Amino acid sequence: MMALLLAGGRSSRARTHKGCRRVEGRPWLYRQCRFLRSQGFAQVRVVLGYSAVGAARCVPPGVRRIWNRNRAGGPFASLRAGLRGARGPVLVVLVDAWLPSPATIYRLRLGLRGAYAAMPVWRGRGGHPALLSHELATAIAGSAHSPKERLDHVLASAGARRIAVQDRSVRRNMNRRRDWWLYLRCRKLRRPLWMG
């Protein structure tokens, strides 16, 4: 099973690439990759786009870096680039999203059985990350690019299985300074981040 981190955006609301923001001395991308490896994802890929050279330094050794040369194509172009050659189910993680709980990842793995995709739902609302079957990942990687294509639309049309989780973090992102502050505050209090 593979994990794919999408980190190709401009980070226009932040001064630096979101993946390079430091959390307790380590870049956020580094922490995300290490967490995913600890959850049994033998292969972790990071898709870079804008600020790729600087962001690549924040990725730990042993993680495959993929450059999305079609940066203007947006997040879906990054997704397609990262999925090429995938050999099994793929967990799609956004660089500006909180990490899910280990229990959420486990439930997504169970929920993928017999489905094209599984996505977490907290209090009736969908969130991240999404787990794609090998068939869906291959179809997305080989699809013709449309500038209006979005993963949530693909998941809906594929009939993604919605998995109820007790993990508020699946709805959280880290787009604004306040979002980072909340994340760091939860870490400092040593509260489980997913209970938020």
Predicted regions and their residues:
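Conserved alpha/beta core of the MobA/IspD/sugar-nucleotide pyrophosphorylase nucleotidyltransferase superfamily
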Residues: 144-196
